[in-house]
């Protein structure tokens, strides 16, 4: 049985003129939930990403990195190290594994998430995918490293070449986003990419109908509009990039209400 839909809502109205901070407008998935609920939610969230082609901006960024002569030359003697922060159920990294296998690009993939139950779900999903002999990415998926931890405490022996995040930054407070930008700028050797949502009243209004029509987890009907309310507009990113003293990043609007930030060295 799934928990009841309960959440704290702000007592004063929030407008779309500004971003709602996570503490003002929590998602149901922000609270403590049993593993079965988290697993089912993350499985259906992957369906949302596939339906909305949410991986497309991230894979296009990787194509740009792979097409850079300087980048290829700097890592040609070893696999490209890619870190996905806030990896959730791991569907983005599994999509990247397929991308890399199709292009014969050696990669070393790591997923980092604060929630140990998300890490557990990512491993479970990956074990299933890697057992499919028809899947060209199965060997890469089997070797994805799933780590539980706080990104700001994460200090690997070998720095990542690329740091990615997908639908992660809207879970952070605005000061934490600035800190995350600085962390990526300091740690990513070749570049970094944020794939998140564009704050939109219209998208928030229409989104709840999709889970009902397509049979997705009922929490998604609630959390989708909340995520859109906690999301960003270009002016937000301009301000936070300035606060992080980053001038070389680009802000990119993509289809299906995605707003991304890219940095290639």
Task: Describe each model-derived feature in a short phrase.
Residues 197-242:
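C-terminal alpha-helical "lid/dimerization" subdomain adjacent to the S-adenosyl-L-methionine
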Residues 1-31:
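N-terminal auxiliary segments of SAM/dcSAM-dependent transferases
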Residues 164:
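A conserved beta-strand element that flanks and buttresses the S-adenosyl-L-methionine
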Residues 83, 89-132, 140-153:
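Class I SAM-dependent methyltransferase SAM/SAH-binding core
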Residues 28, 35-69:
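Class I SAM-dependent methyltransferase Rossmann-like catalytic core
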Residues 230, 234-265:
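Conserved Class I S-adenosyl-L-methionine
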Residues 172-183:
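A short, conserved alpha-helix within the catalytic core of class I
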Residues 188-197:
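Conserved beta-strand signature within the Rossmann-like core of class I S-adenosyl-L-methionine
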């Amino acid at each position: 049985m799934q928990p009841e839909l309960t959440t704290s809502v702000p007592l004063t109205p929030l407008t779309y003129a500004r971003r709602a901070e996570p503490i003002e407008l929590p998602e149901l998935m922000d609270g403590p939930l049993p593993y079965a609920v988290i697993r089912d939610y993350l499985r259906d969230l992957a369906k949302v990403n596939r339906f909305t082609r949410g991986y497309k901006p991230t894979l296009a960024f990787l194509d740009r990195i792979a097409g850079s002569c300087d980048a290829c030359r700097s890592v040609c003697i070893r696999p490209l190290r890619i870190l996905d922060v806030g990896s959730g159920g791991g569907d983005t990294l599994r999509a990247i594994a397929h991308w890399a296998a199709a292009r014969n690009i050696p990669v070393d993939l790591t997923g980092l998430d604060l929630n140990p139950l998300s890490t557990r779900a990512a491993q479970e999903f990956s074990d299933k995918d890697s057992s499919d002999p028809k899947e060209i990415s199965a060997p890469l998926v089997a070797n994805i490293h799933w780590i539980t931890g706080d990104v700001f405490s994460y200090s690997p022996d070998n720095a990542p070449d690329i740091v990615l995040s997908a639908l992660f930054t809207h879970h952070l407070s605005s000061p934490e986003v600035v800190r995350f930008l600085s962390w990526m700028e300091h740690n990513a050797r070749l570049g970094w990419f944020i794939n998140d949502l564009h704050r939109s009243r219209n998208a928030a209004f229409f989104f709840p109908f999709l889970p009902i029509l397509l049979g997705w987890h009922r929490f998604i009907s609630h959390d989708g509009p909340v995520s859109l309310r906690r999301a960003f507009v270009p002016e937000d990113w301009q301000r936070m990039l300035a606060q992080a003293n980053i001038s070389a990043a680009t802000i990119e609007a993509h289809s299906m209400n995605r707003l991304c930030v890219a940095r290639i060295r």
